[in-house]
């Protein structure tokens, strides 16, 4: 957890949520001589997931309720280690689907509700969505990741000015 002090900010081409900043760029913080390729790899997965936690936090604040379950689809849903990492960082159960066509299924469900074949999305989901597995948060890991997330949230402010200075110099 936290890759022994190594943190990655995943702003490779700027960021939109929660920062509207096209000039921010990704960075590794805390690189040391003992870090290996596996640490950088895990740090990238953690950084991406911590960035998604920013979105989860905003959605929960706006909705004024906790998200009870998140659905993971696509290639990342096949990585059991990443699913567990997500459950621990989000402190929310992560479920995968029996079908790998999550986006297509969602579009078809929206169309079916739009055509009034179902009263609402919940009724449609009850008919079409089949879950494969559920990964539960691990309390000790959740607590450890809260500390990592606190450090992660400071990275944007700590690197923003340097990234903006860099962009102002290369644009000339």
Predicted features, each with a name:
Residues 1-172:
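Glycine/Thr-rich phosphate-binding loops that ligate phosphate moieties of nucleotide
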């Amino acid at each position: 957890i936290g890759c022994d002090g190594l943190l990655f900010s995943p702003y490779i081409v700027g960021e939109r949520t929660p920062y509207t900043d096209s000039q921010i760029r990704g960075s590794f913080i805390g690189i040391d001589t003992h870090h290996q390729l596996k640490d950088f790899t895990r740090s990238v997965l953690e950084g991406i997931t911590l960035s998604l936690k920013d979105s989860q936090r905003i959605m929960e604040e706006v909705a004024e309720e906790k998200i009870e379950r998140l659905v993971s689809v696509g290639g990342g849903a096949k990585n059991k280690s990443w699913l567990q990492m997500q459950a621990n960082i989000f402190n929310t159960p992560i479920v995968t689907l029996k079908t790998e066509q999550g986006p297509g299924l969602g579009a078809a469900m929206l169309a079916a509700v739009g055509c009034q074949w179902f009263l609402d999305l919940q009724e449609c989901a009850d008919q079409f969505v089949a879950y494969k597995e559920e990964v539960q948060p691990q309390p000790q890991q959740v607590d450890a990741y809260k500390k990592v997330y606190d450090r992660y949230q400071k990275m944007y402010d700590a690197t923003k000015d340097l990234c903006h200075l860099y962009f102002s110099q290369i644009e000339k």
